[in-house]
Structure formats: C-alpha cells, structure tokens
Amino acid sequence: MYSCANRKDIGRALLNGEIDLSLQIECAEIAARGLHFYPAVYMPEIGIPFHTPPEVPRGHIPLEQAVKYRWMFAGTPEQSLYETALLHEASRQRAEIIRGVKSVQYKLPSLMLTPAVYYRRPNLEQVFVLDWNKGMRFGIVTKAEPDPVVEEYVRQLQHLLPLLSEKLFGMKLEPVEE
C-alpha cells in the first residue's frame, strides 16, 4: 500500500511507476496528466441536510426536487466531471448554490453534496441520494499504457467492484458498461 497526500502526488507516482493503479472519481485532471481512466461503477452524490424542515425528502430524490433547496458542495464542485456538469445543470434550473458553509452558521436550510465514496454506508433516513445522470464514474486510473499484468488486474477490478459495491459503499452501484 502506497500513501499519497493528494491527486497530484498520485498522478506523479503513477507516471513514475511507483504505483500501478489508483481508485478514483473521473476528473479532467486524469487525462490532462497523460493517465488512463477505466470506469467501473456509477457513484451517486449524497445530500446531507442542514437546518432543513422535516418535509425535505430523504432516500432517493431527483434533481428537480433537490434544486428547491440551497446547495453547497463538500469540496470544489469542479473536482469531478460529473459535479461540474451537475453544477451547470443545477444553475440552469436556478438552484441557489453557495460556495461555503456560511449558511449553516446562519441556520438557513441547506443541502451539502458529497460523492458517496466519501460518505460510506449512508443512512437513507438521514440523507438523500441524488438521482441524476446515474452519478459520477468511479474507476481505476493507470499510466497511459499499463503492462499486461496491470491490465488484467484492472479488468478483474472492473468486474468485481459492482459486485462488492454494497459491501464497500453500503449501496448497490450500477456498473459502467462500455
């Protein structure tokens, strides 16, 4: 097991051959660094309500329902291709999106969105799963031309991640078919 402080370090380690692969959410930075992304599963966005009235739904909700509330992203919304597209679509539908947690301090109803990979085994009585565009693609990142052993390992991971998703993430995730 190799430890990296951030995605930049992971990219460097992949390019230098210090590591063979990494499990990540798809982002533009992967291709920009000359790395390859192999999708495995669709990973949904989890919404964590703050100071919301009891009628704010829990469980699975569509984007059209979620845009009625103030949003904030747990990280930078541009961290993944999916969150960038989600940000643009929510803005198009006139969602109120804030860039920080100040609304929580003022006790205004807000929903914090975070990729499910960062919120394992969500309790759907307390949070919601955003149903929009299947979710972000989660998969395996390698250098552009991995060796045959790594390629076979990637194929096995692509097959196993959907089967193990409920055990790993607390919810059944849909495989990415390509």
For each predicted feature, which ranges?
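Central regulatory/effector-binding core of bacterial HTH transcription factors
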Residues: 1-29
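Short beta-strand-to-loop elements that line the ligand-binding cleft
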Residues: 1-6, 73, 91-103
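Short, hydrophobic alpha-helical packing/hinge segments within bilobed ligand-binding/sensory domains
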Residues: 9-13, 19, 98-109
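Short beta-strand and adjacent tight-turn residues that come in two discontinuous sequence segments
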Residues: 19-26, 100, 111-116
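Beta-alpha-beta core module
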Residues: 31-39, 43-44, 96, 104-152
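Flexible hinge/capping segments at coil-to-helix
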Residues: 36-71, 151
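Secondary-structure junction motif
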Residues: 63-93, 168-170
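C-terminal effector-binding regulatory domain of bacterial HTH transcription factors
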Residues: 82, 133-134, 138-178
